[in-house]
Curated annotation (Swiss-Prot):
Protein name from the UniProt record: NAD(P)H-quinone oxidoreductase subunit 6, chloroplastic
Membrane disposition: Multi-pass membrane protein
Sequence intervals crossing the membrane: 10-30, 33-53, 61-81, 92-112, 152-172
GO MF term set: NADH dehydrogenase (ubiquinone) activity; quinone binding
Alphabetically ordered keywords of this record: Chloroplast, Membrane, NAD, NADP, Plastid, Plastoquinone, Quinone, Thylakoid, Translocase, Transmembrane, Transmembrane helix, Transport
């Protein structure tokens, strides 16, 4: 999406905040239903990032597959699990949680500083060659094939890893 700079930056911050808050909700909510809805918020924010990055096909695939199918499946699986009783004396924040919070926060800030200091940060990846190639292709399926095998290969690989982790988590929950 070709937006003016300030609007683009505002949307990035807004969707990034939704992504971070949704991720914290997945981790911190003790109710699995609330965690599943927070996961839905995370997946929607990721698809909105793809829309901002001019990847409408990847965004629609993200919405249809992950939010529309996988997240709904997780919510139904959690709802059909025989009533887990939560301990009333459950301490919400333990020493291990604090250590994990400190380590994860440190890793987060390390990644942010690494990304900002990388020489490839801020490069516009769309080139004139890609635009000329898109004009030469006959139909949309050829364009989608070229983009999936070149430009959007890393996002789809990351999406497949997320799907694998979600399936392993669903199997672990189902076995309990």
């Amino acid at each position: 999406m070709d937006l003016p700079g300030p609007i683009h930056d505002f949307l990035l911050v807004f969707f990034g905040s939704g992504l971070i808050l949704g991720g914290l909700g997945v981790i911190l909510f003790t109710n699995p239903i609330f965690s599943a809805f927070s996961l839905g918020l995370v997946l929607v924010c990721i698809s909105l990032f793809y829309i901002i990055a001019n990847s409408q096909f990847v965004a629609s695939a993200q919405l249809l597959i992950y939010v529309g199918a996988i997240n709904v499946l997780i919510i139904f699986a959690v709802m059909f699990i025989n009533g887990l009783e939560y301990d009333k004396n459950l301490r919400l924040f333990t020493l291990g949680d604090g250590m994990t919070l400190v380590i994860c926060t440190g890793i987060f800030f390390l990644l942010i500083t690494t990304i900002l200091n990388t020489s490839g940060y801020g490069i516009i990846w769309t080139t004139k060659l890609n635009q000329i190639l898109e004009q030469d292709l006959i139909n949309n399926s050829q364009q989608i094939g070229i983009h999936l095998s070149t430009d959007f290969f890393p996002p789809f690989e990351l999406i497949s890893i997320i799907l694998l982790v979600a399936l392993i988590g669903a199997i672990a929950v189902a076995r309990q």
